[in-house]
Amino acid sequence: MPTSIKAIKESLEAVTSLLDPLFQELATDARLGVQKALKSRQKAIQTDLAEEERLEAMLSYEKALYKKGYQAIAGIDEVGRGPLAGPVVAACVILPKYCKIKGLNDSKKIPKAKHETIYQAVKEKALAIGIGIIDNQLIDEVNIYEATKLAMLEAIKQLEGQLTQPDYLLIDAMTLDIAISQQSIIKGDANSLSIAAASIVAKVTRDQMMANYDRIFPGYGFAKNAGYGTKEHLQGLKAYGITPIHRKSFEPVKSMCCDSTNP
């Protein structure tokens, strides 16, 4: 067994089980640095085990479908139903069988600082990705519920021509009129890894669009609020009026459109 604290730390990094004999051997080492390293590694392993358990639970829908013979399960989710401005964006993602991506979760539960990293991990591992975007004008024409469906259908259509085609759809709280077997899952982005993958792809895609709109239409805080009705956004509406990306069927934009004193 290594004796220097530096060597012990290096040995601990290779340990992946809480039952490893090295932990028991080091428990009798009275040096503060050793005990600190020991507890740190044990905590890290516990964190990894908890993450593995969480990911395994989020594969329950997929594993049940694999047992039934389905091979290419697509997760589908959308982002942007509630904002006053910008599009609704949906993504359709097919991950390899039993694929686990550390940190992947409902995009609302992932710290913003980690969005890009997990998004890139999904892009690297996914067998196929489709993205559907429905702009504010069509949202106003058909309503946000129907626009969400259209975005999801467009995301599925974007898979055409890719090597992997879906034989089953797991959809976040929605049923689609399409000839592919499917299941609607309430809070699917928190209960299915495939849907969670679609959630982060849709989220990052839309956030990038809104950051670009923030440069085109400054004063509304689009890069920070993604078009939601924050205080800064509402103040921008009062100060500068409605932009071409605002949803005129959503309040308070709708009332501003009816007010002849506003553009």
From Swiss-Prot:
A Pfam family annotated for this UniProt entry: RNase_HII
Annotated residues for binding of a divalent metal cation: 77-78, 172
GO cellular component, one term: ribonuclease H2 complex
Signal sequence interval, chain numbering: none
BP-aspect Gene Ontology terms: DNA replication, removal of RNA primer; mismatch repair
GO molecular function, one term: RNA binding
InterPro entries: RNase_HII (IPR022898), RNase_HII/HIII (IPR001352), RNase_HII/HIII_dom (IPR024567), RNaseH-like_sf (IPR012337), RNaseH_sf (IPR036397)
Keyword Manganese: yes
Cofactor entry: Mn(2+); Mg(2+)
Tagged with keyword Repeat: no
EC number: 3.1.26.4
Co-factor binding details: Manganese or magnesium. Binds 1 divalent metal ion per monomer in the absence of substrate. May bind a second metal ion after substrate binding.
Catalytic activity: Endonucleolytic cleavage to 5'-phosphomonoester
EC class: hydrolase
Keyword annotations of the record: Cytoplasm, Endonuclease, Hydrolase, Manganese, Metal-binding, Nuclease
The RNase H type-2 domain, residue ranges: 71-262
Cellular compartment(s): Cytoplasm
Domain of life according to the entry: Bacteria
Protein's job: Endonuclease that specifically degrades the RNA of RNA-DNA hybrids.
Family the UniProt entry places it in: Belongs to the RNase HII family.
Name this protein carries in UniProt: Ribonuclease HII
Source organism (scientific name): Streptococcus pyogenes serotype M4 (strain MGAS10750)
Lineage, opening ranks: Bacteria, Bacillati, Bacillota, Bacilli, Lactobacillales
